[in-house]
Amino acid sequence: MLMYKKIVGHKKNMLPATLNNIDDSQNVALNRKKSENKKLTLQEKIELSWQFLYDLTEIILNKFSKEDVVQVNKCGQILFENGVRYEHVVDLITPHQVRSHTQLVEQEQSKGKKALRM
């Protein structure tokens, strides 16, 4: 009950905005500038997507506990040993392409298992 009172007590009365009191001209100008910028080249997309992955890795390594990092590394090693591979895809693809790629990977894995049995 005490937490409820604290939460409710800190809320400020918020009234809905009317069209007369909104000045969004700065936001509109910024959004127009963004859309006028050139589209990213494939090389820029690749660099940005890899940078995102590197940043994410740094966050995991720096913010999680040592035990969590060890556990993630163990899971990754087990996946790697069982044939799971990472494929970095920059552009969006259609669900059909995802299904066909998944089917190809499954077929390759089943061929590998059959070869091991012989």
Swiss-Prot record:
Pfam families (alphabetical): DUF2660
Record-given protein name: Uncharacterized protein RP222
